[in-house]
Amino acid sequence: MNISRVSLLFTALCVVGTVQAVATAPAMPATAPDLDLAIAYYSKTMTPDGVTRESRYQETMLRRPGHVWNARVLPARAAQHEHGHEGGHRHGLNHGAMPRHVRFEGGTPRLAFVDARERAVIAIPATEFSNVDFDGSWERAFYLLEPRLLKTMTVTNRASPTPGARWHEREDKGVYQRVLWDPQRQIPLTMESGDKAGTFYRRVDVTARAGVAAAPWSKLQGYAQREYADFLD
């Protein structure tokens, strides 16, 4: 998210060795609020031969109890390109361009992609999650990171543009992670990671959108149910 989604962006939080001293971690209310979000992703890497590569893209996200819906913001020309394939056979699953629906049922995340043009819901088995850039974590899908990881970070006095939101930071062996966490919305507003050598930098900016959209997963009646294996050549 396909560039890695937020879960991959902050994998370092799970593997960095020593846990730093922390201030009191934010309490997690029993029920997280419904959210409609706009998310902007940016990454920059410097290769050993001095080439800088940058990528940026945007998504929308709807969060409801037991449901998370992500959709890539696509340029108009991308839709035109898709229409150019009508009438032909498409190989593979272009999951990066399709809305992603994650459900939490019976303590287990369920993943599907939705092809609106073909009116099809494509179920992804857990054994194939890694092939479609999903790490299988419901918490990271719902909160954009695992809230417990904030306990491994130090709350700093860095100024926050959002009342009540606090910066949580950590650094290990020249690699840093920074999270601006909003305890009211229970979502990170900004996430940054990088190294002091400047070989990589990644940033995610999250903005709450006004209003609450209708749940798109409630509008899939009549869609064909397909399997991921249908798209494997």
Predicted stretch roles:
Residues 2-67, 219-233:
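N-terminal leader/targeting segments and the immediate start of mature chains
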